[in-house]
């Protein structure tokens, strides 16, 4: 996810909901999926659904049947209709490729606000975030998911940083929760440079932890070249978000997210790098800006399919 709105606008915290029949399998869908077009999915939150029925309608309009599903609305039954979501999705012919969990109090207004409020970093929101994550893990398990992604927050560059050990502890706690349910977790990229994240993952030392790589986030946060970052993080790659952006001209400010294919991501080089690291996993189209989300996602799908 990126910056244009507070994540809690559509991922509200509440008591655990019920989810109904499980769908999917407990295996991250990798090499057997065929070409890129067969691995495309859409991020449910990009469609800004007001209810489960609204999500189904908008998904149909994108032309995609595979989805990374936001778990918080299911947990809280936000807008209604999420009870029994697994069974309903299956009847719609949908495949749930993974889940996404939010954290409490994230403010994407500026780079400074998200640095202070993002992920599992803030002490003030950690107890509620941890409670929600435990409930989301139950939702993900009931849906038969093999992978969930989330923003860990801004990670320290140096082990000597006083927050380094704290974040290692919290993220191991999350990793172990999902490992006990035979699931993997993936940190979303962008808030730190690739070598920093790679070093943090090595120190974390949890085999069920990897990366959800988002090339646009590397540009939005101004954290380096996406293709070079992808090569660095290849050993931890679990899933990709497909999104595009233009880098800021004012250091310390956000870049601009744009429709896929119109920004600064070199998509040909990006997919070549994916092939080079041997990644055959899910590619989830994400759009978090603009007022034409369905149209932009459909255009992104068509753009990628023509590459």
List the predicted regions and their residue ranges.
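Acidic (Asp/Glu)-rich catalytic clusters
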Residues: 56-61, 80-98, 137-144, 176-180, ...
């Amino acid at each position: 996810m990126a910056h244009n709105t507070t994540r809690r606008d559509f991922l509200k915290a509440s008591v655990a909901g019920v989810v109904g029949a499980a769908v999917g399998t407990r295996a991250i869908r990798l090499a057997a999926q065929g070409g890129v077009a067969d691995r495309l999915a859409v991020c449910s939150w990009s469609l800004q659904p007001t209810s489960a029925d609204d999500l189904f309608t908008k998904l149909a309009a994108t032309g995609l049947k595979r989805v990374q599903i936001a778990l918080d609305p299911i947990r809280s039954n936000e807008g209604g209709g999420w009870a029994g979501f697994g069974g309903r999705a299956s009847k719609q012919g949908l495949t749930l490729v993974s889940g996404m969990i939010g954290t409490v109090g994230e403010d994407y207004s500026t780079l400074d606000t998200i640095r202070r409020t993002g992920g599992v970093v803030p002490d003030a929101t950690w107890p509620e975030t941890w409670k929600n994550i435990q409930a989301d893990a139950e939702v993900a398990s009931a849906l038969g998911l093999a992978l969930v992604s989330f923003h860990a927050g801004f990670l320290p560059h140096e082990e000597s940083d006083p927050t380094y050990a704290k974040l290692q502890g919290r993220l191991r706690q999350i990793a172990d929760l999902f490992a006990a349910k035979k699931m993997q977790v993936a940190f979303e990229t962008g808030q730190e440079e690739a070598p920093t994240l790679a070093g943090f993952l090595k120190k974390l030392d949890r085999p069920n932890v990897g990366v959800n790589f988002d090339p646009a986030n590397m540009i939005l946060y101004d954290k380096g070249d996406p293709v070079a970052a992808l090569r660095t993080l290849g050993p931890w790659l679990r899933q990709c978000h497909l999104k595009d952006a233009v880098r800021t001209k004012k250091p310390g400010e956000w870049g601009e997210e744009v429709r896929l294919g119109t920004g600064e991501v070199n998509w040909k080089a990006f997919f070549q790098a994916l092939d080079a690291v041997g990644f055959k996993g899910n590619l989830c189209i994400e759009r978090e800006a603009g007022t034409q989300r369905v149209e932009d996602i459909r255009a992104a799908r068509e753009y990628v399919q023509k590459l």
